[in-house]
Amino acid sequence: MDETLLDDIIRRLLATNNGRTVKQAQITETEIRQLCLASKEVFLSQPNLLELEAPIKICGDVHGQFPDLLRLFEYGGYPPAANYLFLGDYVDRGKQSIETICLLLAYKVKYKFNFFLLRGNHECASINRVYGFYDECKRRYNVRLWKTFTECFNCLPVSALIDDKILCMHGGLSPDIKSLDDIRRIPRPIDVPDQGILCDLLWADPDREIQGWGENDRGVSYTFGADKVAEFLQTHDLDLICRAHQVVEDGYEFFAKRQLVTIFSAPNYCGEFDNAGALMSVDDSLTCSFQILKASEKKGRFGFNNNVPRPGTPPHKGGKGR
């Protein structure tokens, strides 16, 4: 993709933020198609299980909350000042899924070895057809463009390993993973199936109430207990599981004696929750720290601070689309 055009798309997306309101970006359908095509090539040129190195900043669900994505970059540093890994769920729910996904794809194409995107359960046609992205594409462009995004999403990697010690995914563990090679072997492009390793990586949830594997209230995949986290880490010689997929009150929340962390980066999610959002920084020694996007009653006035861990709040249980 032409470097000058790419830089101009990024400039236009960032220019939507004038300090108080965030306007819609003026990007043509042709430009978005080029962006999808270029990013698809980059995704397929890199493994399905990305092998990354610290230092890196990790973000959870963004869900079309474009002003909050810009705030994440304001506090973490705009690329390439910092390396980033996003854990999926870029679209649906929020008002500006198109700006959100376009900026992330543009950064991916421009900084392919410093900026990484994983697939979330909402990067799937059957889900984002229902929860807002399809309607936004149809209203602002056309259904053809939604299909182009779908083809791009089907090529996203599904997991990342940081310095052989921190395993990241959108959802959670799978009872079918015997070796990390099982993740590497998942073919692409691929739609998200109703069961199996790919489904579980995008849909599974930890559950404090159980041991072993349980039924998931979402109607998809499983829940897993702290014992399964400890067992998985020991088997694969890992230190931490890092995932997203659930709203947590403080933006991040530990599980299983700090062997798993949930990160959620959309504060005041959907305007219905009073949750904070978080950004996790992993330094060279693999020490994790958090920057918090505080919850706020007034949209557009979030504060940030470094937060010490507080007692965890129970994960919200919700329907299939959350």
Swiss-Prot record:
Reaction(s) catalysed by this chain's protein: O-phospho-L-seryl-[protein] + H2O = L-seryl-[protein] + phosphate; O-phospho-L-threonyl-[protein] + H2O = L-threonyl-[protein] + phosphate
Annotated binding of Mn(2+) 2, by residue: 89, 121, 170, 245
A Pfam family assignment: STPPase_N
Keywords on record: Acetylation, Cytoplasm, Hydrolase, Manganese, Metal-binding, Nucleus, Protein phosphatase
Main localization of the protein described in the UniProt heading: nucleus
Tissue/organ expression: Strongly up-regulated within developing flowers, especially in the tapetum, the developing and mature pollen and in the ovaries.
Record-level Gene Ontology MF annotations: metal ion binding; protein serine/threonine phosphatase activity
Keyword hit for NADP: no
Cofactor: Mn(2+)
Coiled coil location: none
Active site: 122 (proton donor)
Entry note: cofactor: Binds 2 manganese ions per subunit.
CDD domains noted in UniProt: MPP_PP1_PPKL
Modified residues (N-acetylmethionine): 1
Region (Disordered): 303-322
EC number of the protein: 3.1.3.16
GO CC, any one term: nucleus
Annotated compartments: Nucleus; Cytoplasm
UniProt-annotated binding residues for Mn(2+) 1: 61, 63, 89
Family: Belongs to the PPP phosphatase family. PP-1 subfamily.
Function description: Serine/threonine-protein phosphatase that possesses phosphatase activity toward para-nitrophenyl phosphate (pNPP) in vitro.
Designated name of the protein: Serine/threonine-protein phosphatase PP1 isozyme 6
Source species of the chain: Arabidopsis thaliana (Mouse-ear cress)
Lineage: Eukaryota, Viridiplantae, Streptophyta, Embryophyta, Tracheophyta
